[in-house]
Amino acid sequence: MSGEKRYLTAGLPGTGGTIKETADDFVVEEIPLYLPCGEGEHVYALIEKRGVTTLDAIRRLARALKLSERDVGYAGMKDARGVTRQTVSLPRMKPEEVLALELPGIRILSAERHRNKLKLGHLAGNRFRIRVRGVVSDAVARAEAILAVLERRGVPNRFGEQRYGAQGNSHLIGRAMLAGDWCAAVDLLMGDPAKVTGEAWRSAIEAYQRGELEESQRLFPGHCRTERDVIQRLVKRPDDFEGAFRAVNPRLRKLYLSACQSALFDHVVEARLDSLDTVQEGDLAWKHANGACFLVTDPAAEAPRAEHFEISPTGPLFGCRMMMPEGEEGALERSLLAAEGVEPASFDLPGGLRMEGERRPLRVPLGDPRASADADGLVLEFSLPKGSYATAVLREVMKGGRPD
């Protein structure tokens, strides 16, 4: 369903290699949308974190400063792997109080006042510095050739496999939810015994598959809280899969639906990979300057703007209110929905799960790319707009390595 197969730079050999062997191999720094003005009730703290997720960092900061976690603002989510530098906003604090903090895994690099709380999405993009180990001897030359193509034509704006969860099936759970197939949704949630680590976890899934619900509940490890909660409901009402699935946290249910959207989008990227840098009649084109979309009626007239990276074709993050393209591109997207057995109205779910949908550019610009070598391997530096993933670049550069 994800459709991630081909390379935009298929004619150029990759570097191979692996990433994230140490924290310093993967460094991400947010590019702010604006800088703190120097006055106001919020302190904008630039933090550097190692081996800590954004949400864990917020918990530690809130606890240390006696704040509610909800009061702490942030612009983007970052995972625990690697070194990340990002800004958080802290209300009713003095900069010197924040600078004095000493927390495991977190360094405070600066603290300045600003008037408003930092909101999700309030960033321009991210700058990456990534070391790839175990590459071929001419890796720098290979990487430079690939980066030059990506800089000219754009980076395929894939979500990639990291969007689909540890077992790679989050999007399938979302699809089952849209289809109202709650038995399938629960089966997928429980997982595949071949894809988990730990004998108890594996045995718990196998017990579920045999219909031994109480035994499965007993065997599931403590970190599998969602699975245990769902099975607890099934023990009481074995045929009520929809009711059992309601035990899943609403935020997690929304994540499954979002993963389904992402997989369908990635399928469109794959289908249109060869023409990512051109717009077709009926396309909904993306203006990179402001994120607005417009219907393309004269592709020849718009071609220079696409060539100069002012505009790009878009793909769907399907939803009940998403604008559909016309012509061949509209037919492609409608056929994709039909093949999955869903329609736009399927996304109009109750219980706060409604997905309105939006357009997303099929390609994004690659900012200031550089490739160099150090004693440990190949070093790649580049920037991407917010919402785009470094794995899309690494996949093209490494080709067959491990860009995760």
UniProtKB/Swiss-Prot annotation:
Any Gene Ontology CC annotation: cytosol
InterPro entries the UniProt entry points to: PsdUridine_synth_cat_dom_sf, PsdUridine_synth_TruD, PsdUridine_synth_TruD_CS, PsdUridine_synth_TruD_insert, TruD_catalytic, TruD_pseudoU_synthase
Residues annotated as catalytic: 79 (nucleophile)
Occurrences of domain TRUD (ranges): 154-364
Membrane-spanning parts: none
Chemical reaction(s) catalysed: uridine(13) in tRNA = pseudouridine(13) in tRNA
Gene Ontology BP term (one): tRNA pseudouridine synthesis
One Pfam family named in its UniProt record: TruD
Enzyme Commission code(s) on record: 5.4.99.27
Listed GO MF terms: RNA binding; tRNA pseudouridine(13) synthase activity
Gene3D superfamilies: 1.10.1510.30, 3.30.70.3160, TruD, catalytic domain
Top class in the EC scheme: isomerase
Record's keyword annotation contains Acetylation: no
UniProt keyword terms in alphabetical order: Isomerase, tRNA processing
HAMAP family: TruD
PANTHER family registered for this protein in UniProt: TRNA PSEUDOURIDINE SYNTHASE D
UniProt similarity note: Belongs to the pseudouridine synthase TruD family.
Function text: Responsible for synthesis of pseudouridine from uracil-13 in transfer RNAs.
Protein's recorded name: tRNA pseudouridine synthase D
